[in-house]
């Protein structure tokens, strides 16, 4: 009997010991599995977050690089445009200066006891005047020629400057040009020769309307003047006792006494 009781007590003790441990063991195992799963999930989320952050940073860096490249390109284009503009202006300026220097020659007139007087003269080889200016000069020259030709045959008169009174050499020139040019036409041949607004002209470049000067009596640089009418001839009022006439420049007398020519009718001097 006593043996049965000990066996019963032992079984009860074993049963009491086994029953409470089984749920706890299961609970502990489940907790461990849950903790492991949570850790794996957190690690995966952290990796995903890190990957997303890196991707965002990479995209931002790429966008910034593109922006910088565009900015540099725009700046380079702007600088190139400014440089091209400056180069074009410089070339244009040099071309204008080159044309200007090629179009004009400085000619100087020496006068005893005075400083040399220099003026810029348009070169014949540099091209013609603009059409409008050329037409204006031609029209004025034609008017002057008509006025002069109408005086042929009238007597010389010292100090005269009108068809009513007659003309001396400078009076004839004064009458022909005084209403056509805006510069003051002097009343003596010597003053006309030294007129600042009249350009010196080579004999080979003479045109209708140019003034031709002579030194016939040794007074001043020039003491006689006529007007070139083309074909190597000029119109003049010679001296007392003679009439206004057309004379050839090739005559020995006039060749010996010729001193130069001036052009008073230009686009700059015409009214």
From Swiss-Prot:
Coiled coil ranges (UniProt) are: none
Annotated region (Disordered), positions in chain: 27-102
GO MF annotation list: cysteine-type peptidase activity; endopeptidase activity
- Bias (Low complexity) occurs at 65-86
Q: Which InterPro entries match?
A: NLP_P60_dom, Papain-like_cys_pep_sf, Peptidase_C40
Effect of loss of the gene:
A triple mepS-mepH-mepM mutant is inviable, whereas a double mepS-mepM will grow on a nutrient-poor medium but not on a rich medium, suggesting the 3 endopeptidases are functionally redundant in vivo. Depletion experiments of the double or triple mutants lead to cell lysis, as well as significantly decreased incorporation of mDAP into peptidoglycan sacculi and increased amounts of the enzyme's substrate (Tetra-Tetra-anhydro muropeptide).
Q: Which residues cross the membrane?
A: none
Task: State the pathway, as annotated in the record.
Answer: Cell wall biogenesis; cell wall polysaccharide biosynthesis
Q: Quick one: a GO biological-process term for this protein?
A: capsule polysaccharide biosynthetic process
Occurrences of domain NlpC/P60 (ranges) = 138-265
- Renumbered to this chain, the Basic residues biased-composition regions fall at 55-64
Residues at the active site:
169 (nucleophile), 224 (proton acceptor), 236
Q: Which UniProt key words apply to this protein?
A: Cell wall biogenesis/degradation, Hydrolase, Protease, Signal, Thiol protease
Q: What's this chain's function?
A: A murein DD-endopeptidase with specificity for D-Ala-meso-diaminopimelic acid (mDAP) cross-links. Its role is probably to cleave D-Ala-mDAP cross-links to allow insertion of new glycans and thus cell wall expansion. Functionally redundant with MepM and MepH. Partially suppresses an mepS disruption mutant.
The protein, known as: Murein DD-endopeptidase MepH
Species source reads Escherichia coli (strain K12)
